């Protein structure tokens, strides 16, 4: 990115990539809202007056994104901006007008939104979000009940116990769970019989959760066999040797943490997005992203009073005496998901439902990449979550956002407001 942005113009002539590719219509690159036009030469000439140094701001993903946002603010204020006064000798008044553009990946989007929208930090000119789990990701439920898959399990946990011991005590990780706004509050956790039909509760309502748009009480705090931390996994909520002396039990601490997650989600949703926000995300039906979490099997033995619950911590309940107990399987529902199919697929981590949330919230532009996207660039498969910025479509969308945001900059001497 830095190399591309530092070579926009030479002798007032656009360099090859900018002239050949950057000027194409956003719709060709998967832009789905139709509110923005192509970059023009004047915009590129203005952008070329600025220096685009790329600074990497890390954060602790275990702590709340609210706190991580403050850490990023301190990094900008104490390291990034002072650098240009100390090392480049810029005038203090000019430095005081300088702002940054945030380019985020995944969870970093939540950090950036907390920074600008919750803390009101004003030295951000605009934001480019990449593959942000904007309203959460149901993948976290799968990981806490089954462990991670593939090579990731070596580091992040191979079963429910290993994952729960860390994630259930980590605000930042739990803030990745689906919020009340995920899929507009509609169900994403389904209890089905062996034939794939959604079961009914004693009131005749489908056992599809959340039933009442409250995943915090219905799923995350629930100690039932299908809860995020069922009773048999409560032992992993506190792995220390001091449990006996604690005044408040591990389950109580966990529920307090869930309450703080709900508060964070609610405040972030109400605060919206920075006024200059551009987003891109993967939306490919071949990238299974655990959109529907389905427990398939007969739960009757698990719901019998006094029953001893046992599961293999990889998503399957077991018993010496009963077969066909619930196991987690991939969606979609065999009986047909009554929900809109527009949110299916994703990038193997963030479901389309969550990736498309910024567009639904009305950000400046949103690029949908993969089989569910449109435009000439979407003739190939959508990208995988971790590798997103290695894809030319994500790179194009990010550069487009940066150039558009730069039009608001005013601290160069040749720009309005400059010195």
Predicted regions and their residues:
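Proline-rich intrinsically disordered, low-complexity coils
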Residues: 25-26, 38, 82, 92, ...
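C-terminal subdomain of alpha/beta-hydrolase-fold enzymes, centered on the catalytic histidine
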Residues: 220, 228-419
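Alpha/beta-hydrolase-fold enzymes
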Residues: 152-245, 257-265
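A Trp-anchored, charged/polar loop motif used as the substrate-binding/catalytic surface
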Residues: 5, 12, 33-39, 69-91, ...
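Noncatalytic linker/hinge segments flanking ATPase motor cores
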Residues: 142-145, 166-177, 319-327
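N-terminal non-catalytic accessory region
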Residues: 1-103, 107-161, 184-187, 191-192, ...
């Amino acid at each position: 990115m830095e190399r591309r942005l530092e070579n926009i113009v030479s002798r007032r002539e656009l360099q090859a990539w900018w002239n050949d590719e950057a000027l194409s219509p956003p719709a060709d690159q998967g832009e789905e809202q139709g509110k923005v036009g192509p970059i023009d030469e004047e915009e590129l000439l203005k952008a070329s007056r600025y220096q685009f140094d790329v600074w990497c701001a890390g954060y602790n993903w275990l702590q709340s994104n609210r706190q991580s946002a403050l850490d990023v603010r301190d990094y900008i204020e104490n390291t990034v901006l002072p650098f240009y006064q100390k090392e480049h000798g810029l005038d203090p008044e000019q430095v005081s007008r300088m702002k940054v553009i945030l380019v985020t990946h995944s969870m970093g989007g939540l950090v950036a939104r907390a920074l600008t929208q919750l803390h009101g930090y004003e030295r951000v000119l605009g934001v480019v979000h990449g593959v942000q789990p904007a309203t959460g990701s149901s993948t976290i439920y799968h990981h806490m009940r089954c462990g991670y898959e593939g090579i990731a399990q070596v580091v992040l946990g191979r079963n429910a116990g290993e994952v729960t011991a860390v994630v259930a005590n980590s605000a930042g990780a739990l803030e990745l769970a689906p919020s009340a706004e995920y899929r507009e509050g509609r169900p994403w956790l389904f209890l089905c019989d062996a034939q794939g039909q959604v079961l009914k509760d004693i009131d005749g309502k489908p056992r599809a959760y959340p039933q009442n748009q409250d995943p915090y009480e219905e799923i995350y705090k629930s100690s039932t066999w299908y809860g995020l931390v069922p009773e048999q996994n409560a032992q992993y909520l506190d792995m220390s040797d001091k449990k006996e002396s604690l005044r408040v039990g591990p389950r109580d601490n966990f529920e307090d943490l869930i309450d703080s997650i709900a508060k964070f989600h609610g405040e972030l949703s109400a605060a919206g997005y920075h006024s200059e926000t551009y987003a891109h995300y993967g939306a490919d039906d071949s990238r299974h992203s655990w959109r529907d979490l389905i427990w398939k099997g007969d739960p009757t033995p698990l719901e019998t009073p006094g029953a001893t619950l046992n599961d293999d911590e990889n998503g399957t309940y077991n018993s010496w005496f009963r077969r066909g107990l619930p196991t987690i399987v991939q969606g979609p529902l065999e009986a047909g998901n009554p929900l809109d199919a527009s949110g299916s697929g994703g990038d193997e981590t963030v479901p389309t439902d969550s990736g498309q949330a910024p567009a639904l919230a009305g950000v400046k532009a949103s690029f949908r990449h993969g089989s569910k996207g449109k435009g000439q660039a979407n003739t190939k498969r959508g990208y995988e979550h971790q590798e997103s910025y290695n894809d030319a479509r994500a790179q194009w969308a990010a550069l487009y956002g940066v150039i558009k945001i730069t039009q608001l900059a005013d601290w160069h001497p040749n720009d309005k407001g400059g010195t």
